[in-house]
């Protein structure tokens, strides 16, 4: 390689290293901040365990939309009543 492309590649690599090293540090629990004390590590893990347990609980949702009457349900009801009439006439 010629000296100019080597110099450009070196500057690009240096720039990427500086940007990567000076970026935001994410610590325990994926929360922004600096380094944590060893005492806070247990608290962070306990907090994460509580969040996981809360998310693992089944969530109940209520349907507030009005569901129109199904024509299949009407047909099923009519067939059931017809069958009852037929069996009632035979006995």
UniProtKB/Swiss-Prot annotation:
InterPro entries: GnRH (IPR002012), Gonadoliberin (IPR019792), Gonadoliberin_I_precursor (IPR004079). The record marks 26-31, 33-34 as: Cleavage. Its main location: secreted. It is found in: Secreted. One of its GO terms (cellular component) is extracellular space. GO terms for molecular function: gonadotropin hormone-releasing hormone activity; gonadotropin-releasing hormone receptor binding. The keyword DNA-binding does not apply. Stimulates the secretion of gonadotropins; it stimulates the secretion of both luteinizing and follicle-stimulating hormones. This is Progonadoliberin-1. It comes from Sus scrofa. The lineage of its organism: Eukaryota, Metazoa, Chordata, Craniata, Vertebrata. The gene is GNRH1.
């Amino acid at each position: 390689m010629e000296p100019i492309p080597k110099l450009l590649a070196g500057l690009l690599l240096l720039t990427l290293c500086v940007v990567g090293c000076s970026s935001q540090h994410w610590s325990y629990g994926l929360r922004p901040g600096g380094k944590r004390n060893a005492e806070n590590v247990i608290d962070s893990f306990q907090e994460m365990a509580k969040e996981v347990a809360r998310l693992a609980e089944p969530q109940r949702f209520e349907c507030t939309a009005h569901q129109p009457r199904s024509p299949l349900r009407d047909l099923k009801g009519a067939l059931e009543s017809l069958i009852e009439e037929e069996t009632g006439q035979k006995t």
